[in-house]
């Protein structure tokens, strides 16, 4: 009499491996740019924090600071460069970059147009 074996055949195992490979091929590109999204979020967050620091400094001294270390004691996130700040009469703008994102920067303008995207709203950080 013939006994039945319990377990999977080689074909069944190969089909499972192929299906897992297809699912991985679909999922990996969706998560590939997760790091760059995190870097952009850090740059935007730093610009929002800079708005708070600048306006706080302005309320104390009636001028906007251009030196983030001395005047405001502002420290950017890891990998984010110290923002470049330009001040005007009652307005200022700033841009920053990240060490892991080449040819990419974020900017913000307060009481003036955004230095990167002129259609951005007042105080809205935009990356390009």
Task: Enumerate the predicted regions with their spans.
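Compositionally biased non-globular segments, especially hydrophobic aliphatic-rich helices
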Residues: 12, 41-44, 121-123
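Conserved catalytic core of two-component sensor histidine kinases
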Residues: 17, 44, 51
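Short, contiguous, well-ordered secondary-structure segments
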Residues: 1-2, 56
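Periplasmic/extracellular, small/polar-rich flexible segments of pilin-like filament-forming proteins
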Residues: 48, 52-128
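Aliphatic-rich helix starts adjacent to a transmembrane/signal segment
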Residues: 30-47
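N-terminal single-pass transmembrane signal-anchor helix
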Residues: 2-31
């Amino acid at each position: 009499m013939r006994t039945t074996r319990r377990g999977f055949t080689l074909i069944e195992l190969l089909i499972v491996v192929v299906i897992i490979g297809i699912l991985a091929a679909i999922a990996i590109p969706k998560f590939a740019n997760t790091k760059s999204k995190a870097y952009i979020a850090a740059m935007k967050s730093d610009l929002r924090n800079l708005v708070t620091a600048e306006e706080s400094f302005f309320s104390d001294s009636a001028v906007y600071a251009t030196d983030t270390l001395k005047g405001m004691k502002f420290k950017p996130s890891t990998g984010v460069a110290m923002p470049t700040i330009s001040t005007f009469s009652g307005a200022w703008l700033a841009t920053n970059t990240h060490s892991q994102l080449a040819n990419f920067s974020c900017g913000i303008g307060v009481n003036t147009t955004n230095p990167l995207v002129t259609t951005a709203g007042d105080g809205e950080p935009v990356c390009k």
